[in-house]
């Protein structure tokens, strides 16, 4: 089947922002204007197409990243697909709540460009900065849409100043708002020198284009000059022409801005009010004009299986070998497990076999689906640049590479943060126990930041996630979708243990010899702290065959399993480096199990001698409060072991930045509400792990042991 849309007409984009900036509302307008939906779904009614989970509709927030495909023809004319002139836009609407940061992370990994939304009243908020940094890490070109210009207090100039201060100095407005709050009617296109006025009676589908009013002419010319000057810096021919005073054509200007945006040297800024249907079509035009097609970004790199140092590329072509990355797993009530993936090269037909190079397994693709939020359309094949979902991939997980056995490649996987909060969960009946195990396994498959473990001492099932809301939604889904009835404990901080000094020649010896075949395993290890975030590093330094090769793996595994339960308070141990340096074996009695136990014994002894300490998650907290309550807010943060990082003015309010241990933040929202009569708000996100002060650590350890 030939390609219906040329690759240069593809746009794979994400919509990302802080919670409540209007991402889902903007996506709903895009679906409406591109003809994907015939009526607009509103978030506050619980009817948004992209928020299809019950939990999303009840809470009015986006939890999972819904994917959809639509078609757009530049200059405000949307067309049915198939005419060849339209552009295919694959959109992923991502959550803005910090607890669901994994959804943003995995979406950015497979996108070519992104639109960052701001609330024009609040400007750049903490989670805006977080998603911006995530996009920087994946080098995703992006543009900014300053939304909610219709709200009282909207201030485009202040937003622009905050963008340049906190996100990028290379941000340039290509539109200026006409009015703000109740008086907002549309925008000025600074490149075309025209004013766009949107008609309310057609829900913004029609608009008038008039000359720029006199009072906006100076601002328009300044913005135009700044934008063109910044864009032509990357094109010598245009630079010379511009400096010589020659007028550049609109096509030349757009091409220069496009090149600079794709090179991440230019951030175009637009404005509008999605809820009032103003500015969304112009934003779609800008996506076409300035964000990259798959062929505009460098080909993705990977390595050969079992050869991490041998790098290869997956060229963005239909006639290249097939290569795709699975970026999301979802459980669908009707078809079971859905695997969302992005195709980087080649073609794959439904019903064909693919090779999962990450797992070294061959799998059959049952059906291929084009997703529209939670609705689906069956398709026969996928090609380079497509984002689609497959049914039937049993062993594939988030971050796995799908390719052909003849041309294997492993694409760079995604890195996910560790959970910071734990909850104990107990099934109410025996029937619930079986259902609980299945539910937790499926939910953990979907979400790499959700972990399940069993407490070695109590036998309780412990679930861990990125925050209280994250775990609340997991438990809610477990009860609704999997019909599990369970008792849920209070959220607990996910403490960790580590060591502070190096220890050498620590012995672990496991011997059972009492007639018949016995057990014999003997190891000697060195152990030292490694850098934060390094996890567990194991090095085999054995020489002379004192431990046979087949027993090295079991030693490593024994230590790895022992890491689950630290020596201080039974918390998982992180960031250590172990060197296996010596040992001995017995021709008859040695076994894998004996060496596994010996490894575990050596680790426990080494941990006791290596100055073990307790670590706690520390959160980055931002509080926005009216001046009148600042004293109380600051005093309260200090009483929570908070460290104040700085204070800035935002409109009439003060913004306090601080780092506070997560253990001290439970119940903070209630306290802040009562301190400020409901006028202060806060947001928090994980920052780092830090050693717990001695007195506090003793308190935690004695509580656990009691």
Swiss-Prot record:
Subcellular location: Cytoplasm
Domain of life: Bacteria
CDD domains from the UniProt entry: EF-G, EFG_III, EFG_mtEFG1_IV, EFG_mtEFG_C, EFG_mtEFG_II
GO cellular component: cytoplasm
Binding-site list for GTP: 17-24, 93-97, 147-150
GO molecular function terms listed in the Swiss-Prot or TrEMBL record: GTP binding; GTPase activity; translation elongation factor activity
Entry's Gene Ontology BP terms: ribosome disassembly
Record InterPro entries: EFG_II, EFG_III, EFG_III/V, EFG_IV, EFG_V, EFG_V-like, EFTu-like_2, G_TR_CS
Key word Cytoplasm present: yes
Coarse class of the protein's main subcellular location: cytoplasm
KW Lipid metabolism (keyword) present: no
Domain tr-type G: from-to ranges: 8-295
Disulfide bonds: none
UniProt keyword annotations, A-Z: Cytoplasm, Elongation factor, GTP-binding, Nucleotide-binding, Protein biosynthesis
Function: Catalyzes the GTP-dependent ribosomal translocation step during translation elongation. During this step, the ribosome changes from the pre-translocational (PRE) to the post-translocational (POST) state as the newly formed A-site-bound peptidyl-tRNA and P-site-bound deacylated tRNA move to the P and E sites, respectively. Catalyzes the coordinated movement of the two tRNA molecules, the mRNA and conformational changes in the ribosome.
NCBIfam families for this protein: EF-G, PRK12740.1-5, small_GTP
Similarity remark: Belongs to the TRAFAC class translation factor GTPase superfamily. Classic translation factor GTPase family. EF-G/EF-2 subfamily.
UniProt name for this protein: Elongation factor G
């Amino acid at each position: 089947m030939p390609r219906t849309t040329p690759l240069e007409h593809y746009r794979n984009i994400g919509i990302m922002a802080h919670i409540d900036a209007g991402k889902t509302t903007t996506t709903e307008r895009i679906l409406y204007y591109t003809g994907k939906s015939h009526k607009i779904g509103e978030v506050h009614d619980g009817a948004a197409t992209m928020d299809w989970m019950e939990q999303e509709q009840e809470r009015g927030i986006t939890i999972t990243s819904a994917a959809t495909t639509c078609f757009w023809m530049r200059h405000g004319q949307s067309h049915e697909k198939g005419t060849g002139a339209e552009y295919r836009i694959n959109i992923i609407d991502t959550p803005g709540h910090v607890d669901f940061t994994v959804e943003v992370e995995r979406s950015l990994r497979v996108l070519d460009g992104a639109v960052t939304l701001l609330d024009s009243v609040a400007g750049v908020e903490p989670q805006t900065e977080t998603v911006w940094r995530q996009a920087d890490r994946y080098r995703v070109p992006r543009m900014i849409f300053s939304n909610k210009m219709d709200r009282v207090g909207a201030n485009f100039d202040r937003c622009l100043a905050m963008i340049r201060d906190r996100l990028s100095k290379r941000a340039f407005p290509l539109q200026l708002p006409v009015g703000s709050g109740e008086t907002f009617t549309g925008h000025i296109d600074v490149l075309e020198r025209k004013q766009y006025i949107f008609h309310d009676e057609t829900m913004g589908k029609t608009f008038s284009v008039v000359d720029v009013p006199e009072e906006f002419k100076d601002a328009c010319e300044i913005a135009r000059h700044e934008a063109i000057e910044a864009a032509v810096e990357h094109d010598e021919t245009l630079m010379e022409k511009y400096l010589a005073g020659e007028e550049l054509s609109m096509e030349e200007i757009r091409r220069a801005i496009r090149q600079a945006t794709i090179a991440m040297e230019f951030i175009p800024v637009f404005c509008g009010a999605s809820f009032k249907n103003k500015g969304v079509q112009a934003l779609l035009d800008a996506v076409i004009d300035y964000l990259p097609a798959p062929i505009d970004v460098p080909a993705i790199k990977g390595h050969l299986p079992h050869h991490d140092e041998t790098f290869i590329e997956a060229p963005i072509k239909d006639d290249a070998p097939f290569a795709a990355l699975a970026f999301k797993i979802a459980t669908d009530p009707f078809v079971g497990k859905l695997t969302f993936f992005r195709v980087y090269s080649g073609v794959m037909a439904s019903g064909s076999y693919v090779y999962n190079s990450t797992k070294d397994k061959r799998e059959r693709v049952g059906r291929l689906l084009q997703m529209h939020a939670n609705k689906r359309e069956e398709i026969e094949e996928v090609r380079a640049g497509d984002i689609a979902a497959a049914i039937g991939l049993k062993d594939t997980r988030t971050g796995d590479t799908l390719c052909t056995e003849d041309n294997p490649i492993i694409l760079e996987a995604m890195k996910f943060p560790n959970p910071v909060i734990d909850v104990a969960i107990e099934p109410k009946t025996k029937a619930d126990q079986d259902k609980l195990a299945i539910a937790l396994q499926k939910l953990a498959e979907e979400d790499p930041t959700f972990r399940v473990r069993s407490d070695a001492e109590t036998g309780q099932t412990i679930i861990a996630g990125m925050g209280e809301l994250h775990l609340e939604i997991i438990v809610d889904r477990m009860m609704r979708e999997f019909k599990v009835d369970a008792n849920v404990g209070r959220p607990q901080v996910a403490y960790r243990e580590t060591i502070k000094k190096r220890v050498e020649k620590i012995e672990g010896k496991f011997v059972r010899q009492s007639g018949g075949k016995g057990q014999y395993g003997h190891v000697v290890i060195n152990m030292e702290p490694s850098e934060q975030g390094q996890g567990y590093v194991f090095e085999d330094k054995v020489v002379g065959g004192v431990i046979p090769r087949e027993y090295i793996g079991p030693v490593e595994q024994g230590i790895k399993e022992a890491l689950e339960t630290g020596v201080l308070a039974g918390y998982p141990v992180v960031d250590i480096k172990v060197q296996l340096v010596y040992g001995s074996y017995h021709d008859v009695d040695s076994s894998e199990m004996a060496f596994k136990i010996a490894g575990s014994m050596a680790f426990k002894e080494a941990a006791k001698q290596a100055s073990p300490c307790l670590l706690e998650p520390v959160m980055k907290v931002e509080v926005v409060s009216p001046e009148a309550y600042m004293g109380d807010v600051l005093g309260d943060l200090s009483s929570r072991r908070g460290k104040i990082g700085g204070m800035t003015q935002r409109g009439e309010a003060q913004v306090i930045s601080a780092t506070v241990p997560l253990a001290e933040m439970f119940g903070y929202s209630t306290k802040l509400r009562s301190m400020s009569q409901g006028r202060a708000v806060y947001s928090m996100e994980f920052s780092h792990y830090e050693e717990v002060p001695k007195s506090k650590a003793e308190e935690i350890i004695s509580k656990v042991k009691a």
